[in-house]
């Protein structure tokens, strides 16, 4: 399979331009998008720029902070080299297929190549209506902009594949939701915005020609090694399955709940995308749901791996016309590929869980040991993040159970498990300090707790941004103790719990 032609004829990069756009998706056929101009903002004001990410993308942060930069980040000015488009896609939403969704309040400005030669999208979220808006106003309230900035950057600091946030801007205008709210625009960075739903869009129309164009483009952009395989499209599918199996495991190891895991919110590049009603658990429970629209718990915490597998099955269905020779052979190949998801997920999950438990060697019974701890945590309302952080200290001290015991409603439930855990630790020759160091690197002390995010949003809506900035700074170092910010590691006090989160559309 030759390289995708769109990459060979991408727009030439202007090294003198403040943002060095090098666009490829806008070279695809126009069935893939709508060319559109962002809506303007009445009185744009910069809220935050991600300096480190800007430098990685070869963009001068000082430009982004200038009036000219803010004009670009708000959609008021189209930068040289930018080719704004709204991408088309379809998707299963809570199991029901919608043949046309698309970017209803997001506009892809273009692509840049970072200092390591990796390609990224720059997208404005909250930048106005497109033909995919479906009656919406195309705008974003400030709250969802702040939530995505906080959580996506926290996920990146945790080492979890994710879209990023380059900047947040106040528009100086209000939007009408359940009440009048200040408006904002987020500049999102992603390795691409290719979704399972992008493939479903063309498959649903029987447009095999453009489906092949899309698959070839995705291979070139994300998995170029698949080009040389005997069946490049199956190799591509296998790579996506493996990437999403690893991603699901990473979510489960930190207590992250996506909240709206539709096929249009499943990125084939293996990144977490679309943070609308997402949340991190405080007290552990496998059936935890935060999203206000997930009334039946389809996307509950424990269901996430199975949902990803379901989404991958829908993805396989779109690729059948491209895979192997003949429908039966293609179905057989796809089934063999999706069957590997369970083992790939389980391998990534138990490998990560072993590190959280201080185990370096693979032994029979480790998965059961992990499952038993989680069951006891659920029964005793133990905080997910604090339990694993406290285990780090317990592992370093044979008599150091007190910190973990205090997190359990019935401390004896932990004692029973801890006896077996310490027996398992004794089977490995490893210093206590080496074990503790490894565990600390897998168990953060700081996560974006829901009540902290809500407090930052409420203050921001009132025009005060200190809580937002401080929370972003603390979460940039989630594995460091940062004693001066110890309160950020604490669970919500009674009355502070956030029971529901909202999409923010």
UniProtKB/Swiss-Prot annotation:
What name does the UniProt record give this protein? Protein nucleotidyltransferase YdiU
Q: Where ATP is bound, by residue?
A: 102, 104-105, 125, 137-138, 188, 195, 274
Enzyme Commission number: 2.7.7.-, 2.7.7.108
The gene it comes from is: ydiU
Cofactors needed by this protein, per the record, are: Mg(2+); Mn(2+)
- Catalyses which reaction? L-seryl-[protein] + ATP = 3-O-(5'-adenylyl)-L-seryl-[protein] + diphosphate; L-threonyl-[protein] + ATP = 3-O-(5'-adenylyl)-L-threonyl-[protein] + diphosphate; L-tyrosyl-[protein] + ATP = O-(5'-adenylyl)-L-tyrosyl-[protein] + diphosphate; L-histidyl-[protein] + UTP = N(tele)-(5'-uridylyl)-L-histidyl-[protein] + diphosphate
Question: What residues does Mg(2+) bind to?
Answer: 265, 274
Ranges for the region named Disordered are: 485-505
What are the protein's UniProt keywords?
ATP-binding, Magnesium, Manganese, Metal-binding, Nucleotide-binding, Nucleotidyltransferase, Transferase
Q: Which GO terms describe its molecular function?
A: AMPylase activity; ATP binding; magnesium ion binding
EC main class here is transferase
